[in-house]
From Swiss-Prot:
Belongs to the cytochrome c family. The keyword Transport applies. GO terms for biological process: mitochondrial electron transport, ubiquinol to cytochrome c. It is a single-pass membrane protein. It is found in: Mitochondrion inner membrane. Residues 57-269 are mitochondrial intermembrane. Residues 288-307 are mitochondrial matrix. Its EC number is 7.1.1.8. This is Cytochrome c1, heme protein, mitochondrial. The gene is cyt1.
Length: 307
């Protein structure tokens, strides 16, 4: 009887060992299969991304400076700093440059007279400038269109009535709208400034066709737009010397504001958000320590009851 029980215990022990070994082998096999599946799916994902980028990704080409244009010169713009905004005196001068020079060919379709209030001009000055422009309105009670003086709600008038008229007046190339030109160009204000101040005589051996102008910062180095800025082309009311560089700087600042009129507001809001979040983070850390310090430092002792 004792031998039977002993053999039975040995059999159960052997069965337990076999079951444990089978379970471990199954876990290893499952883990190995999971790793293989994970590696396969990762390789498949990387391959699909590489295939998509190869088919639809941008093509790289090594262009010469003549084909791509010279790299723009980087400048220190106040609005590009974290804690500073637009120079409003420069914005006022820049609007004057746009109005007296650039508006002859380029439009600002997204800027209304009311947008200038508090930025470049007072409300009375903006109303006065708007009233000097006649806008077509209507129809009246008889169904006829009529002309009226401009209001603050009107947008700045375009130089041409439509795109076709713009093309016809510029040898088939319509001048672009300048509302978002700074944000829509690689290099932003640095590129626009370099382009405006980069007009020069072509080097020896370079032929420029009629109707084209040489500018090394423009792709292809030949641009249809003639040089727009010259020294003393405008007369600033604040007495600032109207050099080509100064006029280009001011008009680029104004065009940057036209592309991002909410930039200063975003910076102020971001600074306020960071300040509030910093205070809330400090308060939450203090409250966490206030609540958890007694709990973490608490010691519990078991004292046996005295009989």
């Amino acid at each position: 009887m004792f031998q039977f029980v002993k053999k039975k215990n040995e059999f159960l022990k052997f069965a337990r060992l076999g079951s444990r070994a089978f379970t471990q082998n199954a876990q290893k096999t499952h883990s190995k299969g999971s790793n293989i599946a994970l590696v396969s799916s990762s390789l498949l994902s990387v391959g699909m991304i590489a295939l998509y980028y190869n088919v639809y990704g941008p093509s790289l080409s090594a262009g010469t400076p003549k084909e791509e244009g010279l790299h723009f010169i980087q400048h220190d713009w106040p609005q590009s700093k974290v804690l500073s905004g637009f120079d409003h005196a420069s914005l006022r001068r820049g609007f004057q440059v746009y109005r007296e020079v650039c508006s002859a060919c380029h439009s600002l379709n997204l800027i209304a007279w009311r947008h200038l209030v508090g930025v470049t001009h007072t409300a009375d000055e903006a109303k006065q400038m708007a009233s000097e422009v006649e806008y077509e309105d209507g129809p009246d009670d008889e169904g006829n269109m009529f002309k009226r003086p401009g209001k603050l709600s009107d947008f700045l008038p375009p130089p041409y009535p439509n795109v076709e008229a713009a093309r016809a007046s510029n040898n088939g190339a319509a001048p672009p709208d300048l509302s978002c030109v700074v944000r829509g160009r690689h290099g932003g204000q640095d590129y626009i400034y370099s382009l405006l101040t980069g007009y020069t005589e072509p080097p020896a051996g370079v032929e420029v066709p009629d109707g084209m102008n040489f500018n090394p910062f423009f792709p292809g180095t030949q641009i249809a737009m003639a040089r727009p800025l010259f020294d003393d082309a405008v007369e600033f009311e604040d007495g600032t010397p109207a050099t080509t560089a100064q006029a280009a700087k001011d008009v680029v600042n104004f065009l940057h504001w036209a592309s991002e009129p909410e930039l200063d507001i975003r910076k102020k809001m971001g600074f306020q958000v960071i300040t509030v979040l910093t205070i809330l983070t400090a308060l939450s850390m203090w409250y966490k320590r206030f609540k958890w310090t007694p709990i973490k430092n608490r010691k519990i002792f078991y004292q046996r009851p005295i009989k």
